[in-house]
């Protein structure tokens, strides 16, 4: 006689679904934020791929002069982009059912991609916090991830809101991003904004600190292998002993620069490595969000004059000329002519005609 013991089914279908969603034993953690993250990121990705390949030209300026951005309409991987929603739409919510005939022409895919993408990365951030909570970890992973989330939100949502149209959002492409950067510099002088300068310090400084830390650790590994073996074999996942000598790294760096320029605490060191770029990128996102409402970077529009009233050219004048040139090239239509050019005083080019002696 054979007796079979079967584990009884406990709980309702909903309870089992909840247990599966929040289980940390799954190969990929889903979580409640993942329930919303997965469909939104899938929708954004699918729409982006289709639009990048086959979307028809978009009337970005709202004046019936469409601009093509897809591969099938003459672009390549470098020049291709998902063109932002038309200026004729402004800040209106523009779902596909609002204008089936003109949705593609007015750049509807851009709004669809951006909105779903932003919701998706917000949920990814929440999912990071949720998984950390389930595992009993501290929440600093999602705090660090909030920096790129804030940066993406500032260029895709806050800046268009401040400028009054989603046509001013960053195009979804390589050269589209470069064009956005040039126009941003022309209209807001972002290079002269302290918060952007902090962001540059965060990105380049973070790269420098990462390279310094990695090279110091790699150079001070505790020898566990012979010369003929890879040094990576000297580490076993989960081992208790240190794999490198922080004392040696501290001594080297302290003698190379200055004693107090080197960390002697591994925890404070890694906190600094995380905090430096995160805080600086926070400030950059804040700077873009303020420039969205035209609180721009420093300007040096008043040239230095000598005793005769003549301009003494400085680097600020060169920067101003570059900004005005980029702004004129960007605004392709007379009715959008830059106000800082159209409203300025007329400056004489020459006080008198030169004499021509034949």
From Swiss-Prot:
Catalytic activity as recorded in UniProt: 2 a plastoquinone + 4 hnu + 2 H2O = 2 a plastoquinol + O2
Membrane-topology descriptor: Multi-pass membrane protein
Keywords: Calcium, Chlorophyll, Chromophore, Electron transport, Herbicide resistance, Iron, Magnesium, Manganese, Membrane, Metal-binding, Oxidoreductase, Photosynthesis, Photosystem II, Thylakoid, Transmembrane, Transmembrane helix, Transport
Residues that hold Fe cation according to the record: 213, 270
Superkingdom of origin organism: Bacteria
Propeptide: 343-358
UniProt name for this protein: Photosystem II protein D1
Binding residue positions for a quinone: 213, 262-263
Residues that bind chlorophyll a PD1: 196
Keyword Coiled coil in record: no
Annotated site residue numbers, Stabilizes free radical intermediate: 188
EC number: 1.10.3.9
Cofactor note: The D1/D2 heterodimer binds P680, chlorophylls that are the primary electron donor of PSII, and subsequent electron acceptors. It shares a non-heme iron and each subunit binds pheophytin, quinone, additional chlorophylls, carotenoids and lipids. D1 provides most of the ligands for the Mn4-Ca-O5 cluster of the oxygen-evolving complex (OEC). There is also a Cl(-1) ion associated with D1 and D2, which is required for oxygen evolution. The PSII complex binds additional chlorophylls, carotenoids and specific lipids.
InterPro entries: D1/D2 (IPR055266), Photo_II_D1/D2_sf (IPR036854), Photo_RC_L/M (IPR000484), Photo_RC_L/M_CS (IPR055265), PSII_D1 (IPR005867)
Positions of the record's site feature: Tyrosine radical intermediate: 159
UniProt family annotation: Belongs to the reaction center PufL/M/PsbA/D family.
NCBIfam families, A to Z: psbA
Binding site residues for pheophytin a: 124
Highest classification ranks of the organism: Bacteria, Bacillati, Cyanobacteriota, Cyanophyceae, Nostocales
Organism (species): Mastigocladus laminosus (Fischerella sp.)
């Amino acid at each position: 006689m054979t007796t079979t013991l079967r584990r009884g089914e406990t709980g309702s279908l909903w309870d089992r679904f909840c247990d599966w969603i929040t289980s940390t034993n799954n190969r990929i953690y889903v979580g409640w934020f993942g329930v919303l993250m997965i469909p939104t990121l899938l929708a954004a990705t699918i729409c982006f791929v289709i639009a990048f390949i086959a979307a028809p030209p978009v009337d970005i300026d709202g004046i019936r002069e469409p601009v093509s951005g897809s591969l099938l309409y003459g672009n390549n991987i470098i020049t291709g982009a998902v063109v932002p929603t038309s200026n004729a739409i402004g800040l209106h919510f523009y779902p596909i059912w609002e204008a089936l005939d003109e949705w593609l022409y007015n750049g509807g895919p851009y709004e669809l991609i951006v909105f779903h993408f932003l919701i998706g990365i917000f949920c990814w951030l929440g999912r990071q916090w949720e998984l950390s909570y389930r595992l009993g970890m501290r929440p600093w992973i999602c705090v660090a991830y909030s920096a790129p989330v804030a940066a993406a939100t500032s260029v895709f949502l806050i800046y268009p809101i401040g400028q009054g149209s989603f046509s001013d959002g960053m195009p979804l492409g390589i050269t589209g991003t470069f064009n956005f950067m040039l126009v941003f510099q022309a209209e807001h002088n972002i290079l002269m904004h302290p918060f952007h300068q902090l962001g540059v310090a965060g990105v380049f400084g973070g790269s420098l600190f990462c390279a310094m830390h990695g090279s110091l650790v790699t150079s001070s590994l505790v020898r566990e292998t012979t010369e003929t073996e890879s040094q990576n074999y000297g580490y076993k996942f989960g081992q208790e002993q240190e794999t490198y000598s922080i004392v040696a790294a501290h001594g080297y760096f302290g003698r190379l620069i200055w004693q107090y320029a080197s960390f002697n605490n591994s925890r404070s060191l890694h906190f600094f490595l995380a905090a430096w770029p995160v805080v600086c990128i926070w400030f950059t996102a804040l700077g873009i969000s303020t420039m969205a409402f035209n609180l721009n970077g420093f300007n040096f529009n008043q040239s230095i004059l000598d005793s005769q009233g003549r301009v003494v050219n400085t680097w600020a004048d060169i920067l101003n000329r570059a900004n005005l040139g980029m702004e004129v090239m960007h605004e392709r239509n007379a009715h959008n002519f830059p106000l800082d050019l159209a409203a300025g005083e007329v400056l004489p080019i020459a006080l008198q005609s030169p004499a021509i002696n034949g």
